[in-house]
Amino acid sequence: KLHIPTISTKKSVELIRAAKAEGLKVSCSVAVHNLFFTDEVLEGFGSNYKTNPPIRTKEDVEALLDGLNDGTIDMITSDHNPLDIEHKKLEFDKATDGIIGLETAFGALNTMLPLELLIEKLTLSKAVFNIKNQPIAVGQVANLTLFDPSQSYEFTEKDVLSKSKNTPFIGKELKGKVYRVLVG
């Protein structure tokens, strides 16, 4: 089986959809920021938008969302890539590619996809890699996320739990606040 990580173009969605229709064993993922932002944000050359694959056109984003909705795209990844300030506080062309995304994944996409589909694509789709989901039951390891899908908030630097702050989401209005992740 072939897994293609972090696709970002309409053409990628079309090719993977065709491959799956032919019965080929292929899976893929898309990064949160490639769903949330379009290339219009690049006009200001902010280095926190510099990532690989790059942020694409509105047409690409729409195709990626269609691919999630029809099952072509198997999972959403945070594509969490922490970088120190020395690698991001540079001119756009000299800055290192990378965005952190763990803290913003749910809130960024909560209004873009149906809640059940979003949860599936963020969590349950790990079965693509033969990683089993544990049932919520006595004696089982619990992996739980406590969240309020209706709470809107402005994402600030205080919300960044990572040591790195390389995120274009600072100052963005998000909806769907994660309060706690419990593992154990």
Where do the model's predicted regions map?
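Short amphipathic alpha-helical segments
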Residues: 16-17, 88-89, 158-159
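Short, glycine-/Ser/Thr-/acidic-enriched flexible segments
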Residues: 9, 33, 81-83, 151-152
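His/Asp/Glu-enriched, well-ordered alpha-helical/loop segment
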Residues: 1, 48, 69, 75-76, ...
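C-terminal cap of metal-dependent C-N hydrolases
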Residues: 94, 141-184
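Glycine/Thr-rich phosphate-binding loops of Rossmann-like dinucleotide-binding domains
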Residues: 12-13, 36, 84-86, 145, ...
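Histidine/acidic residue-rich metal-binding segments in metalloenzymes
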Residues: 1-76
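Short, flexible, glycine/charge-rich loop motifs used to bind or transfer phosphoryl groups or to couple energy/partner
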Residues: 64-66, 135, 171
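A short acidic, glycine-rich active-site loop
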Residues: 49-59, 96-100, 167-173
